[in-house]
Design a protein with these regions (language model features):
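Hydrophobic residues at beta-strand termini and immediately following loops
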Residues: 133
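Post-Walker A helix-loop "phosphate-sensing" segment adjacent to the P-loop in P-loop NTPases
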Residues: 100-119, 154-155
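Residue-level preference for the first positions of well-ordered beta-strands
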Residues: 77-81, 130, 178
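A short, basic N-terminal segment
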Residues: 1-78, 107-109
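Walker A/P-loop nucleotide-binding motif
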Residues: 74-96
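Mid-core helix/loop region of P-loop NTP-binding domains shared across ATPases and GTPases
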Residues: 18-37, 115-127, 139-147, 155-197
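Alpha-helical scaffold elements adjacent to nucleotide-binding pockets in ATP/GTP-utilizing enzyme cores
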Residues: 61, 93-97, 143-151
Length: 197
């Protein structure tokens, strides 16, 4: 997912739920009307995160972790991880949490279709405070670096040492504060470079 798509998803208004109707009323509707109602309901529920005590705790923990990292000096930071059984909504939860944090961070800039900032005097750059990537099976470090660069609109070709430097520069240039890696278990850790990452 590139930075513009992330921004669009994070700032799009939630889909409205259709007006609830009694089962008796639904049963009297035509097949076409029932299909339309189900389509509206399914569309509105896609990506819906149901509140739970576990989700609230995880949200609080992740928010606190990001805030502590923000206060730390440059260098290594603490890493958060969400782990649970297959298909319980980990990715949906993390995206929901991160997009809420993104909206809070941007504030009035959410209305801008392409937020910008000034990393240094006289320089204007796209403001991309959150970068979200999804790893593919057996991803190597070059694949991760390529995904990060493509997300921010940079060319992804080159030697690992070159693309690593390019990623660091791009993160600094675009004000990246949060890196989200979905399906990190797909990272191929059979070589030292990937394990070091």
């Amino acid at each position: 997912m590139d930075a513009r798509l992330w921004h669009q998803q994070a700032t799009a208004p939630p889909r409205p739920m259709p007006t609830p109707i009694p089962v008796e009323t639904f049963d009297t509707m035509s097949d076409v009307a029932q299909d339309v109602y189900w389509d509206d309901l399914t569309t509105a529920m896609t990506g819906l995160v149901l509140p739970s005590v576990l989700a609230q705790r995880a949200s609080h923990h992740l928010t606190r972790l990001v805030e502590r990292n923000r206060l730390r000096p440059p260098g290594a930071k603490a890493i958060g991880s969400v782990s649970a059984s297959f298909a319980v909504g980990k990715s949906t939860f993390v995206k929901d949490w991160a997009q809420a944090a993104y909206r809070d961070l941007l504030g009035p800039a959410c209305a801008d279709p392409r937020p910008t900032w000034n990393p240094e005097p006289g320089v204007t750059a796209d403001w991309i405070p959150h970068v979200y990537i999804t790893l593919r099976a057996a991803s190597k470090i070059r694949d991760v670096l390529a995904a990060l660069l493509l997300t921010m609109g940079y060319p992804s070709e080159g030697l690992v040492r070159v693309t690593t430097t390019r990623v660091i520069h791009a993160f600094r240039q675009h004000g990246v504060r949060l890196l989200l890696i979905d399906d990190s278990h797909f990272l191929d850790v059979s070589n030292k470079d990937s394990r070091d990452m």
